[in-house]
């Protein structure tokens, strides 16, 4: 299925089209070109169909690399799952590659990306994967994870942490035939494509080209979070496993509004989440980390008790963090007052921001949040 590719909804169709063309041209002219490691980033997973296209003429290839034809520039098509493979316009194959000509970009779902597109069938539907150079991937991730107006030293620290995390995932997923990592922030780094790039992200990524964090010659799990609320955590108090470089350290985020939060639950809301406990009568933090994050939360009802542990405390209740207190409101509600945003492991982004503003450089920031690590050039495989 073909249709003209108009991008956005806040402008008229004509204005939107030319606005996006100017953005694409600006990125193509300004962004520096570097080559290093290719990452496979799943943009759409397990879908029946996915919208694809190219900003320049797109070359369509099959699994053997044979060219099947071309997609016109700035037009989009639906790739659809069919028995035995994928259908795209007039072609049908086991899988499809879409490669832009020149310095073009690919379109997947609802965004523009660098690199090329692979559309492949899986047991759950179609998966659309962006094959992209790690530097170009990071141009986008950096703008998704941090405000590009932040100090360059904070952005450099984020660039190295994000590169390290991506290559850690690449190694961890080495037996996955389809992708290395995805693009959703609940599991991976924020990857929005070219829309989140800027000169500031180019500068931070390029100035740290090929640099990753290692511990005893192995790439580390360089997780990061928005803010911890004054102190990060030891990884074993959150995820159970122990890593010598993910140790609890003082944070520098206490002046950040986003790191202070309050959330109120009616008993009926908790009961709806955990119907097996019946009518909820109490929420009791039973075990704390040394830095007052809730490790075990007991939810008591008239039919039973539910025990949440570790990160399940935060994710099950959709809380910003696990560093909170519980009080009972006059109306019987449960009032949770907390500090921090995220799992409180590794680098605090707001902490990095404040440290950079005080003149601390990116290597000092990384050395503070990741204990005992070394800065190492990429050994690409």
Positions of predicted regions on the chain:
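Conserved, single-site charged/polar hotspot
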Residues: 2-381
């Amino acid at each position: 299925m073909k249709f003209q590719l108009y991008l956005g909804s806040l402008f008229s169709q004509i204005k939107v089209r030319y606005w996006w063309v100017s953005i694409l041209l600006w990125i193509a002219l300004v962004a520096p070109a570097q080559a290093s490691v290719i990452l496979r980033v799943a943009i759409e997973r397990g879908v029946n169909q996915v919208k694809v296209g190219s900003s320049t003429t797109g070359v369509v290839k099959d699994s053997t690399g044979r060219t099947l034809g071309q997609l016109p520039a700035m037009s989009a098509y639906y790739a659809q799952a069919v028995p035995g493979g994928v259908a795209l316009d007039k072609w049908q194959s086991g899988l499809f590659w879409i490669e832009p000509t020149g310095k073009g970009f690919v379109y997947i779902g609802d965004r523009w990306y660098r690199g090329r597109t692979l559309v492949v069938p899986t047991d759950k539907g179609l998966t659309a994967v962006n094959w992209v150079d790690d530097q170009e991937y990071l141009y986008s991730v950096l703008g998704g994870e941090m405000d590009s107006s932040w100090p360059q030293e904070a952005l450099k620290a984020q660039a190295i942490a994000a590169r390290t995390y991506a290559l850690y995932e690449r190694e961890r997923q080495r037996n996955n035939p389809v992708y290395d990592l995805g693009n959703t922030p609940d599991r991976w780094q924020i990857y929005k494509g070219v829309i989140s790039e800027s000169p500031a992200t180019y500068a931070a990524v390029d100035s740290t080209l090929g640099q990753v964090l290692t511990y005893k010659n192995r790439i580390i799990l360089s997780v990061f979070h928005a803010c911890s609320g004054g102190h990060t955590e030891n990884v074993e108090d959150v995820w159970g496993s122990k890593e010598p470089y993910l140790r609890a350290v003082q944070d520098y985020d206490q002046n950040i509004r986003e790191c202070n939060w309050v959330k109120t639950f009616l008993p009926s809301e908790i009961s709806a989440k955990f119907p097996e406990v019946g009518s909820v009568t109490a929420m009791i933090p039973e075990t704390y980390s040394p830095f007052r994050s809730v490790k075990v939360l007991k939810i008591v009802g008239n039919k039973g008790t539910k025990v949440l542990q570790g990160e399940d405390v935060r994710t099950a209740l959709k809380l910003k963090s696990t560093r909170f207190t519980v009080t009972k409101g006059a109306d019987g509600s449960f009032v949770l007052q907390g500090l921090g945003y995220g799992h409180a492991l590794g680098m605090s982004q707001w902490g990095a921001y404040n440290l950079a503003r005080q003149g601390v450089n990116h290597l000092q920031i990384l050395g503070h949040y990741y204990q005992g690590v070394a800065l190492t050039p990429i050994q690409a495989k």
